[in-house]
């Protein structure tokens, strides 16, 4: 009984947190700053940092499609998996934290070139995950929110990143 009350209190405090309530907008702001920095410093940045900056911006666009226009990807996954989630605030915040760890850290630690593998793996998994969820979507059998940006943006950037890492500069990273 005491644990349940403690857990509810912690969840209430977490949901009141600015970053939790506004995780999508914080992601968009950070991605915009990263993209602006990338554009301004393009000529002086290592290619892996450029790629990570582009990934960050594209993931932010991808999250807009997943959560807002048309939105509903997290809700669809929760429904399809039968997870007992009543409030979508926490899953959305988890998505924000994954984005920060997978994108912002590799971008800021640009001298550790192998960290670009995180965004590369995320960019590779995104289209696959959206095709799987789209196939399981009873309404359309093909579409899931996020699939358009995953296919149009992630696949080409993944192909270029693989090409760059294994052909152009295989030893330097």
Identify the meaning behind each predicted range:
Residues 152-173:
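Hydrophobic alpha-helical transmembrane segments in multi-pass integral membrane proteins
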Residues 34-49:
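Short, hydrophobic transmembrane alpha-helix segments
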Residues 99-152:
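Membrane-proximal helix-loop-helix units in multi-pass membrane proteins
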Residues 67-78, 132-145, 166-169:
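A cytosolic-side transmembrane-helix exit/cap motif
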Residues 45-61:
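Loop-to-helix transition at the N-terminal end of transmembrane alpha-helices
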Residues 1-16:
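Short, Lys/Arg-rich, polar N-terminal cytosolic tail immediately upstream
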Residues 75-94:
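Juxtamembrane helix-capping/reentrant segments at transmembrane boundaries
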Residues 25-34, 90-107, 149-158:
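Core segments of transmembrane alpha-helices
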């Amino acid at each position: 009984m005491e644990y349940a009350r403690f857990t509810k209190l912690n969840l209430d405090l977490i949901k009141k947190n600015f970053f939790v309530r506004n995780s999508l907008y914080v992601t968009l702001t950070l991605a915009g700053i990263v993209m602006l920095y990338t554009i301004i410093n393009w000529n002086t940045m290592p290619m892996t940092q450029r790629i990570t900056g582009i990934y960050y911006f594209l993931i932010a666009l991808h999250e807009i499609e997943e959560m807002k226009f048309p939105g509903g990807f997290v809700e669809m996954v929760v429904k399809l998996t039968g997870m007992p989630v009543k409030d979508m605030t926490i899953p959305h915040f988890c998505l924000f934290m994954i984005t920060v760890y997978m994108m912002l850290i590799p971008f800021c630690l640009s001298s550790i070139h192998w960290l670009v593998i995180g965004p590369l793996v995320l960019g590779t998994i995104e289209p696959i995950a959206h095709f799987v969820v789209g196939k399981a979507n009873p309404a359309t059998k093909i579409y899931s929110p996020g699939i358009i940006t995953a296919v149009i943006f992630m696949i080409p950037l993944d192909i270029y990143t693989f090409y760059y890492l294994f052909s152009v500069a295989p030893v330097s990273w």
